[in-house]
């Protein structure tokens, strides 16, 4: 008997390993098909179905095959055994079965309605991912790549609008979706489709927070291929990047909302506690990600890792990943931390990397982003058939479709109207219509929904989220090109050309600045930050910028010499790069270092304003909603700076 049980155990273990290999083989096969399909689409300029939509189609087909072509097994019989001596759920449990001791580990709590009295399907159960895989493995490279590849010039040019859409717009979407869904839930209770008390207002707000996470990856990919107007691209890209971070923290804050008396009633103290949690988690995650990027910048600056590009790239990757893990370990949000880590790495650390490491890091995270995105979208297709606890409710699904469109309209149009009151370059109606159209749901909404599917309301949310992702990716993603034509939005704009950092073009832009942009207070704040960053942060963290011996007081001489790299002194003689900073009085050329660098001819900087007409299609680096007021610019020498654009 003992031998038989041991043989059965070894057989079960072999079967488990076999199922794991099948699971990996399925995803490997799906990715191969997706890559070949992407090549086919790009070769034939087929834009009505994007690669993400194709990945979902392949996932659906594979899920359909696994669902109906595999036989059910007895490994999940649904039988419940009572342990009357246990009063809690231990993390590890030793069970004596016929004098044979077995070890079991805690997996999750299961609601009564999730216990299936019939046979289960081992393959389908195996194909259902642990939700933490999405947050700990697949999402971090996607979010980091978004921050690391950020086009900083256009992003900061529209920073005010992006922050407004990301923070205020996400809050508006969450509230509007929550209110509409609460009305539909009441209708479902009245129709007898739900029991009173099964679905609370906090559940509706939770659904609103996860559905407020937009992910227009399909639209942005088409924008990039068609070279759509850079302002529209930046508004959508910037909103989606920050919106993901805000939605994740907002979802967590709502999930821990717990009034003292009635758990489903409004409690002002609990509400403000949730707001405080939101602000604290967001700020802490921002600080954590930025801190790791600063550590990476200092290590790459003061060591000679640049002589070993492989080690340099490895250190860069591991420290960036550590930002995510440290934030999660500290009870913060790793997604927010890794986003701002990527932005800070691009702004500082990238300048210290060797040329090989610059190429390797960009290609590494681009590749990881590509694989992770396609794995997620393939799994979305699979999940429609492999997830065994779907709850389809037509009224709830109809309400969700209506809610996301109304919420998107309440987000885009009123906020655009308010922003246009302070912007010189208005957000035109066709841009607003395109932003309304581009409110797709994707990886973040799906990952938030699948993270908790134990209760019936959460299962209904997950099923509805999955259908919404399918619809928006296929319909809106496929209709992007016709919509661009119908709205007469310009395409064929070379975004990279607009982002080139050459002295003559920047000086031409500076000579043609409009003096009446937006409010002067914003300009003063931005000018203070830029000056502080240029004079102190970049010289401390990178090899670029003026030597600290010229910017810090004399009594800081030892610290200045310690923190200033030898390259900064060498680059002090060069005038290869000119960068614009704000000056309140007049537009002038600053030659503070000219005494030590007599080889810098003024004519090379283009002092004759008449000889520097503005190049058509060039946008002013600072024009937008940062609020420069009537201030003008001053050109200051930047010492050998190399930025990631």
From Swiss-Prot:
Pfam families: Na_H_Exchanger
Tissue: Ubiquitously expressed in all tissues tested. Expressed at highest levels in heart and skeletal muscle, followed by placenta, kidney, and liver. Expressed in the brain, in the medulla and spinal cord.
Statement: the UniProt record of this protein carries the keyword Glycoprotein: yes
Main location: membrane
Record: glycosylation sites: 96
Alphabetized GO MF terms: potassium:proton antiporter activity; sodium:proton antiporter activity
Entries under InterPro entries matching the protein: Cation/H_exchanger_CPA1, Cation/H_exchanger_TM, NaH_exchanger, NHE-6/7/9
Variant or mutagenesis effect after changing residue 236 to S: Normal protein expression. Fails to alkalinize endosomal lumen. Does not affect endosomal localization
Catalysed reactions, semicolon-separated: Na(+)(in) + H(+)(out) = Na(+)(out) + H(+)(in); K(+)(in) + H(+)(out) = K(+)(out) + H(+)(in)
Lumenal side: 1-20, 67-126, 186-203, 257-277, 386, 451-465
Induction: Conditioned medium from iron-depleted astrocytes increases SLC9A9 levels in human blood-brain barrier endothelial cells (hBMVECs).
Keyword hit for Signal: no
Family (UniProt): Belongs to the monovalent cation:proton antiporter 1 (CPA1) transporter (TC 2.A.36) family.
Biological function: Endosomal Na(+), K(+)/H(+) antiporter. Mediates the electroneutral exchange of endosomal luminal H(+) for a cytosolic Na(+) or K(+). By facilitating proton efflux, SLC9A9 counteracts the acidity generated by vacuolar (V)-ATPase, thereby limiting luminal acidification. Regulates organellar pH and consequently, e.g., endosome maturation and endocytic trafficking of plasma membrane receptors and neurotransporters. Promotes the recycling of transferrin receptors back to the cell surface to facilitate additional iron uptake in the brain.
Quaternary structure annotation from Swiss-Prot or TrEMBL: Homodimer; phosphatidylinositol-4,5-bisphosphate (PIP2) and phosphatidylinositol 3,4,5-trisphosphate (PIP3) could be involved in the dimer stabilization. Interacts (via the C-terminus) with RACK1. Interacts with CHP1.
Protein's recorded name: Sodium/hydrogen exchanger 9
Organism, scientific name: Homo sapiens (Human)
Organism classification: Eukaryota, Metazoa, Chordata, Craniata, Vertebrata
Gene: SLC9A9
């Amino acid at each position: 008997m003992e031998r038989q049980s041991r043989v059965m155990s070894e057989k079960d273990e072999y079967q488990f390993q076999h199922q794991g290999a099948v699971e990996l083989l399925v995803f490997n096969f799906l990715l191969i098909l997706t890559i070949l399909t992407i090549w086919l689409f790009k070769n034939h300029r087929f834009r009505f179905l994007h690669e993400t939509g194709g990945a979902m189609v392949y996932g659906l087909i594979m899920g359909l095959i696994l669902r109906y072509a595999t036989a059910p097994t007895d490994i999940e019989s649904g039988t419940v055994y009572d342990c009357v001596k246990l009063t809690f759920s231990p993390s590890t449990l030793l069970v004596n079965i016929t004098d044979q001791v077995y070890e079991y580990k805690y997996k999750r709590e299961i609601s009564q309605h999730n216990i299936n009295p019939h046979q289960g399907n081992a393959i389908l159960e195996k194909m259902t991912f642990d939700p933490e895989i999405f947050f700990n493995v697949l999402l971090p490279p996607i979010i980091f790549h978004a921050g690391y590849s950020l086009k900083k010039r256009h992003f900061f040019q529209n920073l005010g609008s992006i922050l407004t859409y990301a923070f205020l717009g996400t809050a508006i979407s969450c509230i509007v979706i929550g209110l509409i869904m609460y009305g539909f839930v009441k209708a479902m209770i009245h129709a007898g489709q739900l029991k009173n008390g099964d679905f609370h207002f906090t559940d509706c707000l939770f659904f609103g927070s996860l559905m407020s996470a937009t992910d227009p990856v399909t639209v942005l990919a088409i924008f990039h291929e068609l070279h759509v107007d850079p302002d529209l691209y930046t508004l959508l890209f910037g909103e989606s990047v920050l919106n993901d971070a805000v939605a994740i923290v907002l979802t967590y804050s709502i999930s821990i909302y717990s009034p003292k008396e009635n758990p489903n009633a409004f409690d002002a103290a609990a509400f403000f506690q949730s707001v405080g949690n939101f602000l604290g988690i967001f700020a802490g995650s921002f600080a954590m990600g930025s801190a790791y990027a600063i550590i990476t910048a200092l290590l790459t600056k003061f060591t000679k890792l640049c002589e070993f590009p492989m080690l340099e790239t490895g250190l860069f990757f591991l420290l960036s990943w550590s930002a995510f893990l440290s934030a999660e370990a500290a009870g913060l949000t790793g997604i927010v931390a890794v986003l701002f880590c990527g932005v800070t790495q691009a702004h500082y650390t990238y300048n210290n990397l060797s040329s090989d490491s610059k190429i390797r890091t960009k290609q590494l995270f681009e590749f990881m982003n590509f694989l992770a995105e396609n794995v997620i979208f393939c799994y979305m297709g699979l999940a429609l058939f492999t997830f065994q606890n779907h709850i389809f409710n037509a009224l709830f699904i109809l309400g969700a479709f209506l809610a996301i469109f109304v919420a998107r309209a309440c987000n885009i149009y009123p906020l655009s109207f308010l922003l246009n009151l302070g912007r010189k370059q208005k957000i035109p109606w066709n841009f607003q219509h395109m932003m309304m159209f581009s409110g797709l749901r994707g990886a973040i909404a799906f990952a938030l929904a699948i993270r908790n599917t134990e209760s019936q309301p959460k299962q209904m949310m997950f099923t509805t989220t999955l259908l919404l992702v399918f619809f928006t990716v296929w319909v809106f993603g496929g209709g992007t090109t016709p919509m661009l034509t119908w709205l007469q939005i310009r395409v064929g704009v070379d975004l990279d050309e607009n982002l080139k950092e050459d002295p003559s073009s920047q000086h031409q832009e500076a000579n043609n600045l409009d003096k009446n942009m937006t409010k002067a207070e914003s300009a003063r704040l931005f000018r203070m930050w830029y000056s502080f960053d240029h004079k102190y942060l970049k010289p401390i963290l990178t090899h670029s910028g003026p030597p600290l011996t010229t910017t810090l007081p004399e009594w800081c001489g030892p610290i200045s010499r310690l923190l200033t790299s030898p390259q900064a002194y060498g680059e002090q003689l060069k005038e290869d790069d000119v960068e614009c900073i704000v000056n309140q009085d007049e537009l002038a050329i600053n030659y503070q270092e000219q005494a030590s660098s007599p080889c810098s001819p003024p004519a090379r900087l283009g002092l004759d304003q008449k000889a520097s007409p503005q190049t058509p299609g060039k946008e002013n680096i600072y024009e937008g909603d940062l609020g420069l007021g009537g201030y003008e610019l001053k050109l200051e020498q930047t010492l050998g700076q190399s930025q990631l654009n």
